[in-house]
Structures are given as structure tokens and as C-alpha cells.
Amino acid sequence: MSLFRARRTTVTTTLVVETTDLRFLATRSGRVEKWGSFPLPRGLVSQGLITDVLEMGKIIDELFAGEALGRERVIASVSGLRSVSRVVTMPRLPDSQLSQAVSRVARREMPLAIETLYLSWQTMSVGGNQQRVYILGVPRELIDAQVRALEVADISAHAMDLKPLALIRAVEKAEAIIANLEQDELGINIVVGHLPALVRTFSLESENLSDPGKIDRLVLELQQMVHFYNESREGLPVGSQTPIYVTGRVFGSGDAFDYLADAVGRPVERPSSPIPCPDRLPVGEYATNLGLALKKV
């Protein structure tokens, strides 16, 4: 037996499917090693759904071959479009009974048939005979199409995660507003106590907005979400000094950052990388990838 065993090197490849492109980021032993993007034909991804599984699978296969990316430990994101989440108060139950109880609550609370969703949940807090549970429903067709595309590329995903949850993990703040703005998609996450208090994702595909127009839409949706949260939730409200952390390709522009900062009455910041990385990494653009790399599986 060797007394000096080499330390195990963990290589993880994260993959984000946007409407416009694929974004990859690879880590080795917890450090960012390489990253990049590959443009997608228009219409191949629409409303978060891969419309041609075979074509997408071939593109992913070519990307992984061309960039020499590892296929053994791949963590992929799923769009937040059409996903539904609820925070509910339930009786405190043993684990053996929780699954059925969550399904019953989801059937009552979710606006979509739960047969069309993959459900997951996490207990947020327990007090006395009650517990607060975060329930998430993601459309089955979104996940199924992505799994099939990865299989075409000879990849069995090690894990998958919803894009808004990956962004919350990447930003790593107890209280924050996370704004993600891409060419065809807008996402806003209100984070309280490190947990998703309110999450919304909007498609911009059919709106033909300029970048300032997209930011105006972001500001409008943000104001409505904060007002809704503060009026309807228990606990401390989201204050005027809670910062907005901007992510996504649109905010790679200094002009876009300044436009938002001038339009909202709260601090606007860029996130820093939660893991060691080269200085030249555009953290905001690859924030979802960074959050995927932090996922514990």
C-alpha cells in the first residue's frame, strides 16, 4: 500500500442552455479551468424548450469533442421558464410521510397539473409542530428534452439544477435581488435568508426590445415583485438598500449596468466569483455555470 497516495482530482463540466448559445465552464479540484460559449441556431431553444433533440445533441457532442470537455461529471441547468414554486406551512411530519403530504399540497397550490411537473422540495425551517417547506415544480417536457439531447451526445447528466437556484448559489448572499438578463430571457430572484423567497422568469423572445427596453421591463417587474413580496409575506420586508446583483450577457456592457443603476433606487452590484478563477472570466455571464459548479451532489 502506498503511503503517499495522490489526491483525487475532481473535474466537473457545467453546461447552460440559453436561447442564443451553449455556455460551458469546467473546473478542476474546485478551480475554474476553462470556459466558453457556442452559438445556437435561432429557434432550436424556444420558451426554455429544446425543439429538436437530435440537432441539439449533435451540437453538444461537437462542443464537448472540440473543447476536450469531460463527460463523466456534467452538471446542467434548466430554464426557470414555466417553473412554479411555493413556500407552504405544513404539519411537522416524519420523512416517511412527507413525500405524500407534499404531493397533496402541490396538487392544491400549484396552478399546473402536477402530473406535468417534476416536483422537488426542501424543508426551510421547523418550529414546534409546524414546518415551512419550499416546493418546486418544473415542467417535465423541459427536463425530458434536455436529458434526451445529452444522451444523444453520450452524456448522462451527473445532476441538473434550475437556473434561478444556481444563480442564488453563485451570488452567495443572505439577502439580495438577483437580476439575470439575456437576449431573450429575464429572470428576477428575491433572496431572503439565503433562500428563494420569490422567483420569476419571463420570456422576451416575441417582444423585440432594445437593451434599454429590456432593462425598463426588468425595473417594472422588479418593482411589482418587491411590492408583492412586502405586502403578502411574513417576516422582514425587502428594504430599499437591498442590492441588486446583475448577471447575464446583457449586463456585460457598462452602459447597461449604468442604465439600470440610474433607473432604480437601490444599490446595483456585480457578483464576484464564488470559486477561484482567472481574472478575465466574465463572472456575470457565467454566473449560472459557477452556481452549478457549487452544487453538492
Language-model features and meaning:
Residues 1-297:
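Hydrophobic/aromatic-enriched cytosolic interaction surfaces used to assemble or bind macromolecules
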